[in-house]
């Protein structure tokens, strides 16, 4: 018989099918740990010429699974080979002496001090756009001596297992508001999750001396973002927080599902960093069923747990005009989203979005209850570059800052504040430079139960934020990533501080508009701002930089970090 081996990228498995009968003979588990949630992403297969061994490239665990398939139906797992970041193709040479593995994202992430900025354009050699920072690598594994390879495979497997994500031990003090045990009660009943667009840490908070910032590349300092700065000082400043995503296409998937599928990861690079975006459809946010992760999204977990939820703009399609209701293609959001809260639309003010959310909040106060999980989109920090007649990048970001402050002010003055935690993150960090890493971004946790006025330099990511909300709300994790993420426990404490927040007014002109003479205005005219990331990101970032810093200001380059988790030793030192 002739057998067909099929990689099920969204399921951690490989199906072996008899091509004569169409029957599935067996299913191979390609995951490092049996029973793992989705997230291994087996996406490429290779057989030795004699058909004795099958190699499975697992993109998201950076390892190749090896199977003995000489007896189909009774195949045996042999081990794992650690390779580079996000392996996308595995091939055995025709002579069977080498296994070649192409690693799509190379060996690691880095900083991008010369990253793009809204409003500025730098020479191509100096532009460190996140979508172009990945240098693919090739792993070459010697198979010429099968006995020697079998011995090496034991060591390879041990290394792969050491590198797997494992939940860190999380000792907490008595009365901690984030429950570790499933079903344990938390004094926090409500989670509000705010998603913003595309900014790095240094771009917004790089001027804060309390954190690890670089003020030389801070484009939207405290004079532009007073509420971002005040909230970071009043509550917690996170200066070591990263997004797993590169752009909005995978960013909204990671923000809602702690995972981006093989389909999304392989589709978005075709449309980003090129000038042919009309050629490919945006793959995410409910547009394609194949993009949906096997573990579902945050609202799916809430639905399964009986937790009430509501979306404001996330995975929502705008009405043709502001007088027409929005819609959604996501079944779980039907009846659980606000049809009058517009999603991404740079012609629509974030202040109007804030007003709509606040009106809903007041309605819930009158009714006596609100959804326990609310997801709110505030996207206008994306900006429209220097398009003639549009708000300047500074005005857009200041508008977003004021909307952010007003939302927090309203929540903290509401009857729900004593039982609420607000989590805030950017969907990605593609539109700016950062001296630590191109994935570092601004993030917030705002609640009566946070340790106010502190700096937390723990290594966190979007998956950490998702895991924390899941623990508070009693939701199951969605993927291997949130299941193994470091939860954000350090910023919380057992004592509450009910002082509300008072939003600061804007300190710049919110109506400042680009003129025909603005740097890059003519290029901005050709950009598509009807949806997120439809404009050329490299050019947009440069346009924003020069619009703020001046036409002659050179844009700073990407930095990639080897991520290090600091651990406090018994004597209090960081090792």
Label each region the model flagged.
Residues 2, 50-52, 95-97:
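Short coil/turn segments that connect the beta-strands within blades of beta-propeller domains
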Residues 9-10, 59, 104-106:
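Short loop/turn segments immediately following the C-termini of beta-strands
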Residues 19-22, 69-73, 144:
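Short loop/turn segments that connect beta-strands within beta-propeller blades
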Residues 25-37, 147-174:
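Surface-exposed loop and turn segments in beta-propeller and other repeat-based domains
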Residues 104-133:
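Short, conserved, GDST-rich strand-edge loop motifs in beta-rich repeat architectures
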Residues 155-575:
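N-terminal pro-sequences and low-complexity stem/linker regions of secreted or lumenal proteins
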């Amino acid at each position: 018989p002739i057998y067909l081996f099929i990689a099920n990228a969204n399921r951690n498995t490989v199906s072996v099918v008899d091509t004569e009968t169409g029957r599935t003979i067996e299913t191979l588990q390609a995951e490092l740990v049996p029973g793992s949630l989705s997230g291994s992403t087996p996406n490429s297969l290779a057989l030795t010429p004699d058909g004795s061994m099958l190699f499975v490239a697992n993109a998201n665990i950076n390892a190749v699974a090896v199977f003995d398939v000489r007896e189909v139906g009774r195949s045996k797992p042999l081990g794992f080979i650690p390779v580079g970041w996000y392996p996308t193709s595995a091939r055995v040479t025709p002579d069977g002496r080498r296994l070649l593995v192409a690693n799509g994202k190379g060996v690691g992430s880095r900083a991008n001090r010369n990253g793009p900025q809204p409003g500025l354009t730098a020479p191509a050699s100096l532009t460190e756009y996140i979508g172009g920072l990945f240098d693919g690598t090739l792993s070459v594994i010697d198979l010429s001596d099968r006995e020697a390879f079998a011995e090496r495979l034991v060591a390879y497997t041990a290394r792969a297992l050491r590198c797997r994500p494992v939940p860190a031990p999380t000792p907490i003090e008595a009365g901690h508001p984030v429950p570790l045990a499933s079903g344990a009660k938390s004094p926090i009943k409500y989670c509000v999750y705010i998603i913003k667009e595309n900014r790095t840490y240094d771009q917004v908070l790089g001027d804060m001396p309390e954190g690890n910032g670089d003020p030389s590349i801070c484009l939207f300092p405290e004079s532009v973002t007073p509420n971002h700065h005040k909230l970071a000082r009043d509550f917690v400043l996170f200066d070591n927080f990263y997004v797993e995503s590169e752009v909005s296409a995978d960013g909204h998937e990671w923000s809602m599902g702690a995972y981006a599928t093989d389909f999304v990861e392989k589709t978005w690079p075709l449309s980003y960093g090129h000038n042919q975006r009309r050629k490919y459809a945006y793959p995410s946010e409910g547009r394609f069923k194949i993009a949906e992760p096997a573990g579902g999204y945050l609202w799916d977990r809430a639905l399964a747990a009986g937790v009430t939820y509501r979306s404001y703009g996330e995975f929502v399609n705008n009405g043709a005009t502001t007088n027409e209701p929005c819609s959604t293609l996501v079944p779980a959001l039907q009846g659980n989203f606000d049809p009058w809260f517009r999603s991404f639309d740079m012609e629509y003010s974030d202040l109007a979005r804030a007003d709509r959310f606040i009106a809903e909040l007041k309605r819930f106060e009158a009714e006596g209850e609100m959804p326990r999980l609310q997801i709110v989109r505030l996207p206008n920090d994306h900006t429209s570059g220097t398009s003639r007649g549009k708000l300047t990048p500074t005005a857009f970001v200041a508008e977003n800052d004021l909307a952010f402050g007003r939302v927090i002010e309203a929540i903290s003055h509401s009857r729900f504040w004593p039982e609420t935690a607000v989590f805030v993150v950017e969907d990605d960090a593609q539109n700016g430079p950062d001296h630590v890493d191109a994935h570092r971004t601004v993030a917030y946790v705002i609640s009566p139960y946070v340790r106010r006025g502190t700096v937390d330099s723990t290594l966190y990511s979007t998956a950490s934020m998702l895991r924390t909300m899941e623990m508070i709300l009693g939701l199951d994790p969605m993927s291997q990533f949130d299941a193994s993420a470091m939860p954000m426990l350090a910023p919380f404490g057992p004592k509450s501080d009910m002082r509300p927040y008072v939003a600061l007014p804007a300190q710049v002109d919110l109506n400042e508009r680009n003129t025909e003479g603005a740097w890059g205005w003519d290029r901005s005219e050709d950009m598509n701002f009807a949806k997120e990331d439809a404009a050329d990101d490299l050019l947009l970032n440069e346009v924003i930089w020069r619009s703020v810093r001046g036409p002659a200001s050179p844009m700073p380059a990407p930095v990639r970090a080897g991520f290090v988790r600091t651990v406090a030793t018994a004597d209090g030192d960081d090792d």
